[in-house]
Amino acid sequence: MSRKVTKYSAVLAVSLFAAALAGCGSENKEGTVGTGPGGVATVGDTACVQCHSAVVDPLTGESIITQYTRSFHYSKGVGCEGCHGGGAQHNGVGPLPFPLAGQSEAQIAARCASCHNGVIAPLSSSPNFVNGNHANPFGGEEAKENLCSRCHSHEGAIFGAQAGFTGDGNILRNAAYQPVYPQDPETFNVMTCATCHQHGGAQRQVFTQISTAGVPNSRRTVAWDPNRNSINDQYDLCTSCHTVNTMTGTLIGSGNVLQIFTSNAVGSGTKSVTTAPFYHNTRWFRTLPSTHYDFPESKTTASGTTIEGYVIRRNTANPCFDCHGHEFQTNTRRLAGADRPNTIFLDWGQSAHGGKLLQAKVAAAALASSGAAEVDDVMKAGATDATAPGWTHYNWDDTASRGACQRCHTSTGASNFLNNPAGYDRTGAGNSFTHLAGWTSSNKRSDQNELLYCWGCHTKAGTGELRNPGAITEVYPGINSTSTGTTGLDVTVSYPDIKGSNVCMGCHLGREVGDNIKAITDADGILGFVNSHYLTAGGQLFGTTGYEYATRSYANPAFFQHDKIGTAAAPGTGTNGPCAGCHMTTPTSHLFLPVTKDGTGAITAITSTACVTCHAGTFALTPEGLTAEEEEYVASLEALKAALAGKGILFFNAHPYFYRDTNANGIADPGETVSSNAFTNWAGVYGLALWQDVMGAAFNANLLIHDPGGYAHNRFYSKRLIWDSIDFIFDGVLNNDVTAAIDAQVTAARLDSATATAAKAYLGATRP
């Protein structure tokens, strides 16, 4: 038999010890007689235990019955016969429908796969494991070496865990700690299900060795418990090889003392962080904290931070399965390469949802010196305001100051909202961030920040199962201010059920819509700008977010289909709605980009299958054509900004976004872009009766400037909002003089002629 077949068979064979969840086998461990899997009557666990209590784990010597009683299967009432079939014909010597011994590899594999197929038992998916790195290590010969076998072989992992050969490099490199294996490592095998799981499926216990400093002969073996919760849990098991911190809490790294830059309102400097050496402490991609730790010390502004890595929820039941399931193959050592096939993890690490964190890590590694210095530099690299302001700019988990933002700027808030939109507390009071360093129920703040992690959108990363908020009904709160005497009513918008894309809608609908302005009562039209917030593509898609001028129609043309992508109304575009249909039907689905771009921002390829499916033949899209439309869209917004500047309303891309042009030069000068100079006198442009229409033009500009894909999401809606806003703000009348309005900005030197030409090409000579 080939070695490959033997390995595959061994992987699946051992998983028989954990083969059934409720519903797979029908046998009850309490002894109720019935028909078990295989059609043979059952006799109950008591009869099995009578003979098999003396059978022991061949590597640890522990009773398999003792192991089984610690398992999830036992606690859920799935007994021996749930895997092995009814025992009425067995009696110690007779047949069992599904015995372990004497069966062919194909029979054993088929039996295990009946439950461990990624569907019935999604958290224990045998196919994912078989195709992952644990069953297929990069260097198979590492399993044959005495020291390396601790984490690169089945037997070595079990023997080492039992002997307390677990911890940082100081332990693993110390000959006194190394166990004497009862068999030659040359006979060791690659990892199987039973490397981590005992008979019945419970996690194996891991031990380490500790000693008291200065006390001779004080070394002793204790349970490996780096999250210090006195529970044998998944964090303990996984970090026994993928070590994050020592038993005393010291961060794993190169072993050097890191200097972490910090800055706050008082001043700036560095803070020292001691690391313990990992065994592989000279390559960043072999040291887990290089990507799985966020330094709370790294405050880069009074309120912002650098996010150096993912924060593990250490004390939850499945902290590693939050993202990995049994996949175990990330391929994140580099950004690309034929020898590193694409994975969801590779995509996410380069995406905006992931703060482009992996790009920062790979770039730091490329510039670093080799060895421990590489590990240090990569550990300190991270997402910043330059690449990920939505995650780094504020301390989003600070409930007192940012609770209302947590729904979309933290994974915790996003997951809680998507689980129960109607019951979600908008103040953030119901969000717990106890997995972040220093966050408690009393202070409710931490200097670590989250990105949008897998578990923010998914309930089960192993299967990709999404959270299910249902169709989103968004309540946009009314605008009220006692200081300006402003009152406003809530605006409620019910969006259609778009299946998996409902998850996206949870954060891409904006915080205010144009109708919020119309719902305001204000005595003098002097008030702060109503801000749509960022990336409101879902609202644009369904034509609900903009400020719509009276007498003008904003209904989609009959042939408009973008809001139907991913539904039965648009065959061939998927079943998960328009957001997923366009942004996730690409070879790099979790980059969330339907196109690729070069370094200049030009579109080089259209990768979304939805785009290609619909835009064929006469309506085929080309990268060049789409790039031109994007450029013209941006130009039209520049024209709108110029028209607003002509009325003394300057746009600057920082809250509150619109400022007074105090020197009437049409340029947002540094001294003008301060909050004390915010534009507030909307009635001063065309009178009190029209103040809402004036703010509406500014609202539409801000809305679409912050939707860079607005030219594609719903180009008809976007064009009409821009057209009407320019039309009105130019002379206070809706009279379709947009071409003249744009030309006037060129004459006034607020817009260059090339941009004006592109804007007119995008909007056309008549209202879209």
UniProtKB/Swiss-Prot annotation:
In which residues is heme c 12 bound?
A: C611, C614, H615
* Residue positions binding heme c 1: C48, C51, H52
Key words of the record: Cell outer membrane, Electron transport, Heme, Iron, Lipoprotein, Membrane, Metal-binding, Palmitate, Signal, Transport
Residues the record lists as binding heme c 6: C238, C241, H242
Residues recorded as binding heme c 2, renumbered to this chain, are C80, C83, H84
Q: Where is the lipid attached (N-palmitoyl cysteine)?
A: C24
Give residues annotated as binding heme c 10: C504, C507, H508
Q: List the InterPro entries hit by this protein, alphabetically.
A: Cyt_c-552/4, Multihaem_cyt_sf, Multiheme_Cytochr_ET
Quote the SUPFAM superfamilies the UniProt record gives. Multiheme cytochromes
What does UniProt give as the signal peptide span? 1-23
> What induces the gene encoding this protein?
Not regulated by Fe(3+).
Query: Which residues are involved in binding heme c 7?
Result: C320, C323, H324
An example GO biological process term is: anaerobic electron transport chain
> Which residues of this UniProt protein bind heme c 4?
C148, C151, H152
Query: Where does this protein hold heme c 9?
Result: C454, C457, H458
Question: Which superkingdom?
Answer: Bacteria
Processing and modification events after translation: Binds 12 heme c groups per subunit.
Residue numbers binding heme c 3: C112, C115, H116
Please explain the role this protein plays, according to its UniProt record: Not involved in Fe(3+) reduction.
Which PANTHER family does the record cross-reference, listed alphabetically? C-TYPE POLYHEME CYTOCHROME OMCC, DISSIMILATORY SULFITE REDUCTASE SIRA
Name assigned to this protein: C-type polyheme cytochrome OmcC
Species source reads: Geobacter sulfurreducens (strain ATCC 51573 / DSM 12127 / PCA)
The lineage is: Bacteria, Pseudomonadati, Thermodesulfobacteriota, Desulfuromonadia, Geobacterales
